[in-house]
């Protein structure tokens, strides 16, 4: 085991997260490269002096502008919003790593049989009209929904059904207007080789994104995904 002093550990984390020295990433391609090496960046809609994702990138990417992140998410589709740590921005190629989350959401959906008919309505509406937000379709439902994979919950049927379909991976965020999310069918934007690949192994992703992993965190990860044989 490698022994580090507290100072060495601090230096390592600052280097890992690209907070020491000169800029190592430039422009739009630099945004993509940084997020790939970091694993993800958390999205937070609170905007006091800038949203979290924008502040993270501004401090690390030379020449960063907000439009770069929006283009990578909603035009190039090289990145995707994913309900991890509430909402995070991940490289689209990491989609298979989160299949266990989507499986949990599908199992969780069985608690809400009244959603089935409403989900069909959403599918039909998107088929006919394209990407929608919870304001575009008023669904009638009398149930209190709780997400299986993050803190979201509520009694608004339209929002709950869209969030549930988003949690299972059937929908993705097509774009945002301010903090309002618009959803569309994931299969339109994620390549089949990624959309249908089943990878239950997340520990290596979490370790490489954080730069370290303590024993308790690793045990927690093993509760989510077992190591690959051999």
Question: Where are the regions a protein language model picked out?
Answer:
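Long, low-complexity intrinsically disordered regions
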Residues: 1-230
């Amino acid at each position: 085991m490698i022994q580090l002093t507290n100072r060495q550990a601090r230096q390592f984390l600052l280097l890992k997260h690209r907070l020491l020295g000169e800029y190592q990433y430039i422009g739009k391609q630099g945004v993509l490269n940084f997020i790939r090496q970091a694993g993800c960046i958390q999205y937070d809609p609170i905007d006091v002096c800038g949203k979290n994702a924008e502040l993270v990138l501004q401090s690390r990417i030379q020449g960063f502008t907000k439009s770069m992140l929006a283009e990578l998410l909603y035009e190039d589709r090289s990145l995707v919003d994913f309900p991890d740590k509430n909402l995070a921005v991940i490289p689209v190629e990491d989609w298979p790593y989160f299949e266990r989350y989507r499986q949990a959401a599908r199992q969780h959906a069985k608690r809400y049989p009244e959603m089935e008919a409403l989900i069909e309505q959403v599918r039909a509406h998107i088929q006919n009209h394209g990407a929608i937000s919870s304001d575009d379709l008023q669904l009638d439902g009398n149930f209190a929904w709780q997400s299986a994979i993050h803190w979201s919950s509520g009694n608004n049927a339209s929002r709950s059904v869209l969030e549930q379909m988003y949690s299972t991976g059937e929908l993705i965020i097509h774009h945002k207007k301010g903090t309002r999310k618009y959803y569309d069918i994931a299969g339109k934007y994620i390549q089949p080789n990624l959309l249908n690949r089943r990878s239950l192994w997340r520990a290596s992703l979490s370790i490489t994104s954080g730069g370290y992993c303590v024993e308790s965190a690793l045990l927690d990860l093993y509760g989510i995904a077992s190591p690959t044989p051999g």
